[in-house]
Amino acid sequence: MTTRVIYPGTFDPITNGHLDLIERAAAMFDHVVVGIAASPSKKPLFDLPERVALTQAITKHLPNVEIVGFSGLLVDFAKESNANILVRGLRAVSDFEYEFQLANMNRRLMPELETVFLTPSEENSFISSTIVKEVALHKGDVSQFVDLRITGALNAKLHTK
């Protein structure tokens, strides 16, 4: 039986922390669907097609990873993707309470959906898309936190008119 999992997020932008979890999930499971949420309420810097394209570009080396944009309920996306395992990252203990609530809600809405938590590697444990965007906005060097293609996209989006 093939194990299909989804790793959902906004990925605005995708960071080395996200990539670390995608690579580790790809090593653990047969097929990983990276679900990029439209998340219009978060007012993302990059639109959904841009986030999908950037994520595809930096995950090309992973043959069992598929990048898909989605909107709506995560459980509906899980059903559409034929996935019954949800991968989530936990950077800190403070993430756990929220993620625990989400896991329970998702299980209530889709009882066959299991949530697996992965912790990032130590060098990625503090990275967040929000912090990366803030540093990039102020022309700080984010190249150690994101792929160079993401650095270029951030600079183009934030500093060219």
UniProtKB/Swiss-Prot annotation:
Enzyme Commission designation: 2.7.7.3
SS bond list: none
Places the protein is found = Cytoplasm
* Cellular component per GO, a single term: cytoplasm
Q: What Gene3D superfamilies does the database record attribute to this sequence?
A: HUPs
InterPro entries with a match to the protein in the record = Cyt_trans-like (IPR004821), PPAT (IPR001980), Rossmann-like_a/b/a_fold (IPR014729)
Q: Which SUPFAM superfamilies match?
A: Nucleotidylyl transferase
Which residues of this protein are annotated with the site description Transition state stabilizer?
Answer: 18
Example GO molecular function = ATP binding
Named cofactor requirement(s): Mg(2+)
Q: In which pathway does it act?
A: Cofactor biosynthesis; coenzyme A biosynthesis; CoA from (R)-pantothenate: step 4/5
- Which Pfam families does the UniProt record give? CTP_transf_like
Q: Where does ATP bind?
A: 10-11, 18, 89-91, 99, 124-130
Q: Which GO terms describe its biological process?
A: coenzyme A biosynthetic process
Keywords in UniProt for this one?
A: ATP-binding, Coenzyme A biosynthesis, Cytoplasm, Magnesium, Nucleotide-binding, Nucleotidyltransferase, Transferase
Residue positions binding substrate: 10, 42, 74, 88
Reaction catalysed?
A: (R)-4'-phosphopantetheine + ATP + H(+) = 3'-dephospho-CoA + diphosphate
What the protein does? Answer: Reversibly transfers an adenylyl group from ATP to 4'-phosphopantetheine, yielding dephospho-CoA (dPCoA) and pyrophosphate.
Per the similarity annotation, which family is this? Belongs to the bacterial CoaD family.
Quaternary state and interactors: Homohexamer.
Q: Which PANTHER family match?
A: PHOSPHOPANTETHEINE ADENYLYLTRANSFERASE
Q: What is this protein called?
A: Phosphopantetheine adenylyltransferase
The organism is Photobacterium profundum (strain SS9)
